[in-house]
């Protein structure tokens, strides 16, 4: 029986619902305009997967635990989420992929905040579920067209920088905390003069007592302009404008613009999607590139059976707006299986991506010509990784070496030069038809013969490896 025996004089039955009767609809064919979601569901013992999947659909759309008389005032069948398919997760006990379709009318136009509030806002605390993970979403073109997306995109960025045919090189200034503004600017100048395209604030450098944001901006932009004049190349530094309030964030962004900064930075998860979308629109209006850091992502996406997969967070960022997004390295110190990583990298920068379960892509995604986001590979990488990084990420990426630049035994500028020489050698070898995956080490050794900076870097980091099995696998 779907409800308790309690009868109501108002024409409905009160009591606890059996979600399967309303929200499990295996005969439903999703519409082109539906938002689709794939959840990895681990039901509590004794809860059938159909009930668990239906509960997810209900609690993330129109459902509540009991029947209420106001149900009679609307067309619930039009607005409800529907669990239309359930598959057991291969190799796992009591885990299921539950596919849910949501009508487009459930979501506010142009609001990632509202979309996530609906789909994942409340259901993750549901008692009938032992664990729940949002693996993927399909955003219909009709909904995508309500979002601006990235402020500029990959091609516009290349045109602004006048740099083509290779990945861009970056460096995070270290130590991330504790430097005075003047010493921080000095490190920026040396790295840019040595051959890098960008330097970067780390995610947690905002405006602390040892270095207030205005002082940092002034010294950093002095360094950028000086390095630019000396090298003849366009340079930039990701000035972090993340702030306690949106008003303060825009104040910092405006000051960066006044100083001639070509790019600013934002921590999109800790600051929130509302702030990020607002900043992305400001960046488009003001012609400034937007670098996005994913600080806090692993709190949300690291566990295999609970949370939100990063491919969903990456899709949300593309909709909310950002020109760069950190994506892991595959070969460095941070978590990342190659197939899974390249799956969400393609979702960041390609216009049309086919479903491919081997890469964790559950739905075909048409981005409807929305500009792409450039993936940023950073975290524990050095010159020996360069061939693999170029082979894995291709030209439309930023390769960011923090310790791999500033840890050079001769200093920041030689560290930057070593990375630039290694990159140029790999690009030339690739363009000549050489196999970077097979001949990468030989290519680096050959280049090191005529670059003492690269030779010193090769000697320093020849034994450094991060060999841990990736957690993020299907």
UniProtKB/Swiss-Prot annotation:
Compartments where found: Carboxysome
One Pfam assignment: RuBisCO_large
Catalytic activity: 2 (2R)-3-phosphoglycerate + 2 H(+) = D-ribulose 1,5-bisphosphate + CO2 + H2O; D-ribulose 1,5-bisphosphate + O2 = 2-phosphoglycolate + (2R)-3-phosphoglycerate + 2 H(+)
Annotated positions binding Mg(2+): 200, 202-203
Protein's GO biological process: photorespiration; reductive pentose-phosphate cycle
Note: The basic functional RuBisCO is composed of a large chain homodimer in a 'head-to-tail' conformation. In form I RuBisCO this homodimer is arranged in a barrel-like tetramer with the small subunits forming a tetrameric 'cap' on each end of the 'barrel'.
Keywords, ordered alphabetically: Bacterial microcompartment, Calvin cycle, Carbon dioxide fixation, Carboxysome, Disulfide bond, Lyase, Magnesium, Metal-binding, Monooxygenase, Oxidoreductase, Photorespiration, Photosynthesis
Record-listed N6-carboxylysine modification sites: 200
Protein's name in the database: Ribulose bisphosphate carboxylase large chain
One term under GO cellular component: carboxysome
Function: RuBisCO catalyzes two reactions: the carboxylation of D-ribulose 1,5-bisphosphate, the primary event in carbon dioxide fixation, as well as the oxidative fragmentation of the pentose substrate in the photorespiration process. Both reactions occur simultaneously and in competition at the same active site.
Domain of life: Bacteria
Source species of the chain: Synechococcus sp. (strain JA-2-3B'a(2-13)) (Cyanobacteria bacterium Yellowstone B-Prime)
Co-factor(s): Mg(2+)
Keyword Cell membrane appears in the UniProt entry: no
Gene symbol of the encoding locus: cbbL
NCBIfam families: PRK04208.1
PTM comment text: The disulfide bond which can form in the large chain dimeric partners within the hexadecamer appears to be associated with oxidative stress and protein turnover.
Binding sites annotated in the UniProt record for substrate: 122, 172, 176, 294, 326, 378
């Amino acid at each position: 029986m779907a409800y308790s025996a309690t009868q109501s004089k108002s024409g409905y039955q009160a009591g606890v619902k059996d979600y399967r009767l309303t929200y499990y609809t295996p005969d439903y064919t999703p519409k082109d305009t539906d938002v689709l979601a794939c959840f990895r569901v681990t039901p509590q013992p004794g809860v059938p997967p159909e009930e668990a999947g239906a509960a997810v659909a209900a609690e993330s759309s129109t459902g509540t635990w009991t029947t209420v008389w106001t149900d009679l005032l609307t067309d619930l069948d039009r607005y409800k989420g529907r669990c239309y398919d359930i598959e057991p997760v291969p190799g796992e006990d009591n885990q299921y992929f539950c596919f849910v379709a949501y009508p487009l009318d459930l979501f506010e136009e142009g609001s990632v905040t509202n979309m996530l509030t609906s789909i994942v806002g409340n259901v993750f605390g549901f008692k009938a579920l032992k664990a729940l993970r949002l693996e993927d979403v399909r955003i219909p073109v009709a909904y995508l067209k309500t979002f601006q997306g990235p402020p500029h995109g990959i091609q516009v960025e290349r045109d602004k920088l006048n740099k083509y045919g290779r990945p861009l090189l970056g460096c995070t200034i270290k130590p991330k905390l504790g430097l005075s503004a003047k010493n921080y600017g000095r490190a920026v100048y040396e790295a840019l003069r040595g051959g890098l395209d960008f330097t970067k604030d780390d995610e947690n450098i905002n405006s602390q007592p040892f270095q207030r944001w205005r002082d940092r901006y002034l010294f950093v932009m002095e360094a950028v302009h000086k390095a630019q004049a000396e090298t003849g190349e366009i340079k930039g530094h990701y000035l972090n404008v993340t702030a306690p309030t949106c008003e303060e964030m825009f104040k910092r962004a405006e000051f960066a613009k006044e100083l001639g900064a070509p790019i600013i930075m934002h921590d999109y998860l800790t600051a929130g999607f509302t702030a990020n979308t607002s900043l992305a629109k400001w960046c488009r209006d003001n012609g400034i590139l937007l670098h996005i850091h994913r600080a806090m992502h692993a709190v949300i996406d690291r566990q295999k059976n609970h949370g939100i997969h990063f491919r969903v967070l990456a899709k949300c960022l593309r909709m909310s707006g950002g020109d760069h997004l950190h994506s892991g390295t595959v070969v460095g110190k941070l978590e990342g299986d190659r197939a899974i990583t390249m799956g969400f990298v393609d979702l960041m920068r390609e216009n049309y991506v086919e479903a491919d379960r081997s890469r964790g892509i559950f739905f075909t995604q048409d981005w409807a010509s929305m500009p792409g986001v450039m993936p940023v590979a950073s975290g524990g990488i050095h010159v020996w990784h360069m061939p693999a990084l170029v082979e894995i990420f291709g030209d439309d990426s930023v390769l960011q070496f923090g310790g791999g630049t500033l840890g050079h035994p001769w200093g920041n500028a030689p560290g930057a030069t070593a990375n630039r020489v290694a990159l140029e050698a790999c690009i030339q070898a690739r363009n000549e038809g050489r196999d970077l995956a097979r001949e990468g080490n030989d290519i680096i050794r050959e280049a090191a013969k005529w670059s003492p900076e690269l030779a010193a870097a090769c000697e320093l980091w020849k034994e450094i490896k991060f060999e841990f099995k990736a957690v993020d696998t299907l």
